[in-house]
Each structure stands twice: as C-alpha cells, then as structure tokens.
C-alpha cells in the first residue's frame, strides 16, 4: 500500500502515542484484524501524529479540533495524495477518536466527523476512435461460424451500446415455454433488441443496418453450432459457443481481445470499450445527451454526462488541429 503522506511527513517518526498503541492492540486482539489491515491503520495513525506535531504543536492528539484536521487534510492533498487515499486516512483517524470517546470522558467530540476528503477526478472511460471501431468491425479474419458470430457480437455491441451481461442474455426471439421465459431477446425483423438491464429495468434499443447484416449472417450459420438436445437456456440463446452452449462472458472478452490484435487495433479492447465508443460517437454525432442516456440504460443523467468530457476532448483536439490561431509555430 502506498504511503498516505509525502516522505517529508514520515522523517524521524515520533514514538507512538500511548492511546494509538492501545487502539492497535484492541484492533488486533478484540477485532482480530489481519496483520495487513493493522499495518495500514498504524501507518495512517502515524501520519496523524506527525501532522499533529506540525500543525498543532503542543496540543495532545486527543484534544485536536476540526480546524486542525482540515489543515492536515489540506497538507496531504497539496502533497499530491489522491482523494481516495485521504479518505482512507480520515476513516482511520475517525475510528480512533470514536474508540477514544468510549474510554475517555474528556473526548466529547470527534474532530474528524463531518470532514470529507476531496473528490478524486473521475476517470474517463476509454473509447476507440471511429477508425479503430471500423477496423474492428470489418477486419476480423475467417468465415467459419465462430468468426461470423464474433463479427455479429462486435457489431451488436457497437450498434447498441449493450453491457456484456445484456448481450450474453439475448435470446433468438421472445420465447415462453414451460418454466422458461426470455428475459432479453432479438427482433431482427423490427431491427431492435429488448434487454433486461441494471435494476431489472427493460429497454428496447434499435439495431443498426450493419449490425443487422452481421446478425443475419450469423443466424444463417448458427445451426452448425446448435445442439438438438440442448437445455432451454442454450436452445434459445442468440449466441452459442462451439459446444452449443450459451456464449459465456469470459469467452467474449478473450476472443474480442484476440480479434482486436488481429485487426491491428492497438487499444486494450473489451466489451465495455465498445459500449463507451458507442456512447462517445453517438454524442459527438448527435449532441443529444438524453437520448444517449436512454440507449445506454442509465438511471441517472449524471452517469451519461461523463461522455460530455470525452466529447469536449474530441472538440478541443479538432480545434487545435484546424484553427489557424491554435496551431503551434
């Protein structure tokens, strides 16, 4: 685990505060925490003690106030520590003060309560360029049933922005027989898929013409992989493995990565990259955030807004390349 403070905050560490040692013993013998977790707590509390000596000199740690904690947090943040790491430190400190309050009447308030770590910047999802996406769709080698299936899988991911779990759950068509009922299905004639997404929310997504062509080609060879005595879960599955079983998530991930390399796509390609690429390219083309939200099945528009950052990056790049006053001399 990386340290929770810059190196200069860890030089010449002072002996542990007696109550910190007692707290670590309680974590070890009463809560039976692992050595790894104990070491993490010890590091975070050592940082508290070192920063306390700097920003609250002459004040016992047990008497620190919220403004002391905020100054310490600002020091950690200014030293380049991530919001997640600061949150971990605050959690350890908060736990120590809670423990103290149960044992020392003089500790009447927890100075860490109500203090939150700064938010770390959201990691933007990776997306293929349009050229890379086209290469992945059009340059997959082979014409055996598995290769034809893989092209249909890729086209459907990119056309509909489906989650991996949604795609593997697709049936050939809506089916209900005995105890079996389709949760998600393809309607190729209507050129749409109906999927059961997160939170058991069902949505219908249109299928593009290229994906429809790839699906028709796959359906023509699918009988070569189908098994006559298959269980309903496999018999109704849209995508089958070489053994006639419903195609598994791991199989899709492995083959997609291998096919991407064969197509000369340098990015680390996996199903979610195609979902991100779908969203990014749709937003760049339409600018309709609400429509992209509906297509992706996001419950909140906030989940979709991350793609506006990607769109701005795209626009900024085009500006830098095209605007005569933006070009570097």
From Swiss-Prot:
<dbReference type="Pfam" id="PF02899">
    <property type="entry name" value="Phage_int_SAM_1"/>
</dbReference>
<dbReference type="GO" id="GO:0007059">
    <property type="term" value="P:chromosome segregation"/>
</dbReference>
<dbReference type="GO" id="GO:0006313">
    <property type="term" value="P:DNA transposition"/>
</dbReference>
<dbReference type="InterPro" id="IPR044068">
    <property type="entry name" value="CB"/>
</dbReference>
<feature type="active site">
    <location>
        <position position="298"/>
    </location>
</feature>
<dbReference type="GO" id="GO:0005737">
    <property type="term" value="C:cytoplasm"/>
</dbReference>
<dbReference type="InterPro" id="IPR023009">
    <property type="entry name" value="Tyrosine_recombinase_XerC/XerD"/>
</dbReference>
<comment type="similarity">
    <text>Belongs to the 'phage' integrase family. XerC subfamily.</text>
</comment>
<keyword id="KW-0132">Cell division</keyword>
<comment type="function">
    <text>Site-specific tyrosine recombinase, which acts by catalyzing the cutting and rejoining of the recombining DNA molecules. The XerC-XerD complex is essential to convert dimers of the bacterial chromosome into monomers to permit their segregation at cell division. It also contributes to the segregational stability of plasmids.</text>
</comment>
<keyword id="KW-0233">DNA recombination</keyword>
<comment type="subunit">
    <text>Forms a cyclic heterotetrameric complex composed of two molecules of XerC and two molecules of XerD.</text>
</comment>
<feature type="active site" description="O-(3'-phospho-DNA)-tyrosine intermediate">
    <location>
        <position position="307"/>
    </location>
</feature>
<dbReference type="InterPro" id="IPR013762">
    <property type="entry name" value="Integrase-like_cat_sf"/>
</dbReference>
<keyword id="KW-0229">DNA integration</keyword>
<dbReference type="GO" id="GO:0003677">
    <property type="term" value="F:DNA binding"/>
</dbReference>
<feature type="active site">
    <location>
        <position position="275"/>
    </location>
</feature>
<feature type="domain" description="Tyr recombinase">
    <location>
        <begin position="123"/>
        <end position="320"/>
    </location>
</feature>
<feature type="domain" description="Core-binding (CB)">
    <location>
        <begin position="14"/>
        <end position="101"/>
    </location>
</feature>
<dbReference type="InterPro" id="IPR050090">
    <property type="entry name" value="Tyrosine_recombinase_XerCD"/>
</dbReference>
<feature type="active site">
    <location>
        <position position="198"/>
    </location>
</feature>
<feature type="active site">
    <location>
        <position position="163"/>
    </location>
</feature>
<dbReference type="GO" id="GO:0009037">
    <property type="term" value="F:tyrosine-based site-specific recombinase activity"/>
</dbReference>
<feature type="active site">
    <location>
        <position position="272"/>
    </location>
</feature>
<dbReference type="GO" id="GO:0051301">
    <property type="term" value="P:cell division"/>
</dbReference>
<dbReference type="InterPro" id="IPR010998">
    <property type="entry name" value="Integrase_recombinase_N"/>
</dbReference>
<dbReference type="Pfam" id="PF00589">
    <property type="entry name" value="Phage_integrase"/>
</dbReference>
<protein>
    <recommendedName>
        <fullName>Tyrosine recombinase XerC 1</fullName>
    </recommendedName>
</protein>
<keyword id="KW-0963">Cytoplasm</keyword>
<dbReference type="InterPro" id="IPR011010">
    <property type="entry name" value="DNA_brk_join_enz"/>
</dbReference>
<dbReference type="InterPro" id="IPR011931">
    <property type="entry name" value="Recomb_XerC"/>
</dbReference>
<dbReference type="InterPro" id="IPR004107">
    <property type="entry name" value="Integrase_SAM-like_N"/>
</dbReference>
<keyword id="KW-0131">Cell cycle</keyword>
<keyword id="KW-0159">Chromosome partition</keyword>
<keyword id="KW-0238">DNA-binding</keyword>
<dbReference type="InterPro" id="IPR002104">
    <property type="entry name" value="Integrase_catalytic"/>
</dbReference>
